[in-house]
Curated annotation (Swiss-Prot):
Residues 1-21 are annotated as: Disordered. It is an enzyme of class 3 (hydrolase). Belongs to the RuvB family. It catalyses: ATP + H2O = ADP + phosphate + H(+). NCBIfam families: PRK00080.1, ruvB. Keywords: ATP-binding, Cytoplasm, DNA damage, DNA recombination, DNA repair, DNA-binding, Hydrolase, Nucleotide-binding. This is Holliday junction branch migration complex subunit RuvB. GO terms for molecular function: ATP binding; ATP hydrolysis activity; four-way junction DNA binding; four-way junction helicase activity. Residues 1-14 have a biased composition (Basic and acidic residues). It is found in: Cytoplasm. It comes from Limosilactobacillus reuteri (strain DSM 20016) (Lactobacillus reuteri). The gene is ruvB. Has 3 domains, the large (RuvB-L) and small ATPase (RuvB-S) domains and the C-terminal head (RuvB-H) domain. The head domain binds DNA, while the ATPase domains jointly bind ATP, ADP or are empty depending on the state of the subunit in the translocation cycle. During a single DNA translocation step the structure of each domain remains the same, but their relative positions change.
Amino acid sequence: MENDHGILSDHPSGEEESQVEITLRPQKLREYIGQPKIKHELEVYIKAAQSREEALDHVLLYGPPGLGKTTLAMVIANEMGVNIRTTSGPAIEKPGDLVALLNELKPGDVLFVDEIHRLPKVVEEMLYSAMEDYYIDIVIGEGPTAHPVHFPLPPFTLIGATTRAGMLSAPLRDRFGIVEHMNYYTQDELTKIIFRSAKIFHTSIQDEGAHELSLRSRGTPRIANRLLKRVRDFAQVAGKQSIDSAIVKQALSLLQVDDRGLDEIDRKMLLTMINFYHGGPVGLKTIAANIGEETNTIEEMYEPYLLQIGFISRTPRGRLVTPTAYEHLGIEYPTDKN
C-alpha cells in the first residue's frame, strides 16, 4: 500500500526523492528554518571553534525521522568551511570500512554517520580513540605475524544522527561534546518551509493552502515537502494556477491523510487498540501483529507523532488511547475508563 511507506514514510524513496531533498536543503544556519535553540547554540560553538582554529566538538543529533538531522550536519560543515563525508551505521560493517573513511579526512573535516546506533560493536569501540585522541590502532596480519599499527588522525568532527538515542552505549554517547535534541516543527515553521520549497519548485501556493498543508505534515519538514509535491500534481492536473486550501483538502483526502496528519496506518493502529483491546493498555508487539507492521516501524515512524499530539500514552503495561484520540475518531470515550 503506497500510503504506508510512501507519502508519510520518514525515509526518502529512491534516487529522485533524494535529489529533491538535496535541492531543498538550506546551506547556512540563517537559511535553516526552525530549531531556534539548536541554531543559536551551534552559532556560538562554530564561532568559538573558528576563532581558536580548531575542529568543532563532536555532535550528536537525535530525534524522530525527517526533522533535518542530515541537513543540519551539512549546514554545520558549510558554516565551518570544511568538507563532509556521509555514511550510515549499517554501511560501516567492519573496522576496515571505518579506517577507509577516516583516512580521507583532512583537518577540521566532518564525518557524518546516520543511524549511528546501528554501528557494529567492534567499529564503535575503534571510534573511541579516534574521537577522543585522534588515532586508531589496527591489527595487521594474522596469527604469529599479526602486529598492531598506530594511525594518527587529523582533528575532525564526528556528527552522529539517531532516532534511538537510548540505544547508544554510554561510552560512545559520552564522547560527544555537543548533544542536541531535534523537536517537531511548529505550524508557522512548517508554513515557512512550504513557501520556501514552493518557490524552489516554481509553484504558486496561497496562504491558506500552505497553512492547510502544514496542519497535515506531522510537524515534519520531510513530510511537508513530500505532500507539497503530491498536491502540486493534483493542482496541475486540475488546471489550477495556484495551490489553495480546497485542492490541498481534496488531494490529501484522496491520499487518506486527515486534518491532523493521520494516515491509514495511524487510524488502523488506534482503532485496533480501541475495538479489540478497549483502548489499552496493549503491548507494542501485539499492536504490530494485529496491523501487520514491524514493531520498529511503529516505534520510529508512527508512535512518536501520536505521543506528541496526545493521541496515545505509554505506561509500564503498554500503550493507551487517550480521550483526545477517541474524540478525533468520532468515538465516544468509555465511561468505565474515566
